[in-house]
C-alpha cells in the first residue's frame, strides 16, 4: 500500500511539473548541461549541434528575423518562408484594392511568376556570434559617470562593428545583455528581395480579431507565406527580375502527426522585449501610469477607426493594417495591467528586494558594493512618475496621433534646409527624394477619418494632461475653446497642404518654408514640448542601479540558471503541449477545432465571418489526411513555451526537428508575463500545421506549394 501510494505521489508530482510553464528565453549558442538535461527530460531527441551550429546546417539556419519585428522560418528547399498573417498583413494590404481585395479574399500565387515583391521588406539570417564584453568595456572604470561610461562603450562598439564588417555586405550589431553586464556581437546576412506567395482570407488569418486577441481558446489560421530571393550567385540582393529563389541551407519538414499532452515543443525565434529583472518601481509605473495612458489614447483612436472603417469598404482596406497595429498593444496593455494586479507582481518584486537587502547587509563587501541602489531606484521613479503620462500622451495623442501630424515629421529636414538657405540643388534633391514617400502615404490616407482622429485625440490630450506639461499651442487653443478642438482642427485641415497629395507634390516642385503651415506648426510645437519633457525626465538615471542589481541577483542566486531579458536576438524556449487551468474549476483543453470556428461564426461580421469555401469543407467534413484520430480538424493548440512579441511567426518544433505549429500569441491569464513569468498559467498559442496544410491543399488547392513541402507522416 505504501509503495503504491509513493508511486502515485511521484506520478502526480511529475504531472504537476509537466503542467508548469517552462520559463526561459535562452541564447541557443550557449545551451548548457542543465538546459540539455531539461530538454531531454521533456523528450528532445536532437543534439546541440543539430539545433545551433556554425559548422554544419542546423535549425538555426531555417530561422529569420522578419521585417524588423517578427520571426519566420524556411519550409522548402527553394526559400519558401512561413510567418504569421499579422506579420505579413501590411505587405498584403499594400497590394490590395477594392478590385483585388487580397485582405478579404486572400492571395495565392499559382506560380513563382505571380509572387509579389514588397518594397522595404527584408529578412535577416544569423551567421556569427561573439562575446565582446571585454572589448566593449575596455577602458570603462567604476569612477566614470554614466554619461562617460556610455560614451566609452559607444566608442568601443563602433570600432568593433567597423572591424567585424570590413568590406562585407553584412549587418553587425552589438547588443547589451543583463543590463550592460555582458555584450554580444551578432552578424547577419540581410536579404531584401522577399516576395508574397500566399495569405488566407480575412476570415481565417484574422479570425477573432480584437475580441479573441491575447486569449485562449482561439481559432485562428494566423499564417502568411513569402519567398526569399537571391542574386544568381546566391548572395543577398535588392529586388531584380533576374533574382532566383534562395537555395535553403536548412528548412523545416512539416509533421502530420499532430500533438498530444506532454509532447515536447521547442521554439526558435526573435523575442522583442521583456523586463523580468526590473525593480518594484518599474512595475508600479506600468500599473498606475504607463498602461492606463496608452489604453486611453488608443481607445480614442480605435473608436474613430471603427466608425469610418465600418462605413466604407475602401477605408477598411486602407486602414486594416493600421487598425490591427494600434489595437494589438491596446489590448496588450489592458491585459498586462489587469494581470500585474491579479498576479501581485508588485508585491513579489518588493519581497525580492527585501531578500536582496537582507543578503546584501550580511557581508561588508557586498554592502559596500550594492549600497545605495534602492535609493537610486526610488529617486528615479519618484522623478520619472512626474513625466510618464505627459510623455505618453505627447507621443500617442500628439506626434504619433493624427496621421497628418505624423506625416509632417517627414518634412523637418527639408524645411530646415530651406530656412538655413541651403543651395537650390540641395533643396531640389531633398524635395524630389520625398516624392515616393508622399505617394505611399496618400495611397492609404483618408482625410475625414484623420480629421476625426485628430480632434478626438487633442480633446483627450488637453483634458487629461497637466496644463504646465501641455504643448503651448494645445494649451492656448484648448483654453480658448474650452477643450473642444473641432474648429481648430477643421481650420488646420482646410489650410494645410499636408492633407492633399496634389498640393504636397506642387510644393515639392517649388518648396518654401512650411513654418506657417498649421499642421506643420502643430507638429513642431508638440515635438518641441516632447524634447523639453524628455530632457527633464532624463536628468535622473537608473542605469547604474539596474546594472548592479542584476549583477547582485546573479551573485545572490548562484545556483539559478539565469537567462537574459529578450532584446530581439535569437532565443530558444522549450516546453510541452499542455492543458491550462487558469483558475479554480476551470480547465482549458490543449486544442481547438474547426467546429469551434463554426460555433463562433457570425455572417457578415468583420471579426467572425468565415469564407464560404471553408464552410463547405466543414459541412462535408472533408478534412482528408489532416483530421486527428477523432476525425476533427485541429486549428490551434497551446504549449508551455516562453515567448513574447517578436516571436510572432516562430516555428513550434517537435522532438525530431519537424515543424508542428506556428506561434502567434499568448494567453490573457499571463499578460504580465513580460514582467514576471507565470509558472502555472503561462501558455503559448500556436496554429496547428495540419490546419495550414488543409487550407493550402483542400481549400486553396495550391498544389504548386504542396509539391515544395516535405511532409512527415
Regions found by a protein language model. Name each.
Residues 1-8:
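Bacterial N-terminal signal peptides that target proteins for export
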Residues 9-16:
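Bacterial N-terminal signal peptides
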